[in-house]
């Protein structure tokens, strides 16, 4: 339903755009200009791109070709790798090591601020989650507001200006 209304809107605006003179650039080097002078079967004029654009596009494409030809050997794909199918490559990838879900054990006698048993024969560190960190709680509670800081700065600068005068 929405697509139909969009198409109707485009169809309604197309004659106006053609009559006012519209220039479309769909790709580098291709310029379609619709002029009000009717020429051609549909009343739209298709002009070739200007020579400066054409030269710039040709220079860019030849530059790309020359950089691809002069690529070092290590950048070129190996012929054996080209013959190999993607499922064969997945056989050679090593499996990822399983990560332990629990926190790492603490060294005995070490003083760790996050440990429940720090200094008493070791323990397990409790790594705080993001929700328990102070910055996150300030953001989520809405206490920290950049506008409040700006108001404080303005009042301080006004106070200093009053002291200087």
Swiss-Prot record:
Name of the molecule in the record: Uncharacterized protein C3orf36
Species the sequence originates in: Homo sapiens
Region listing for Disordered, in residue ranges: 68-107
Pro residues composition bias: residue spans: 94-107
Gene: C3orf36
Pfam families, A to Z: DUF5560
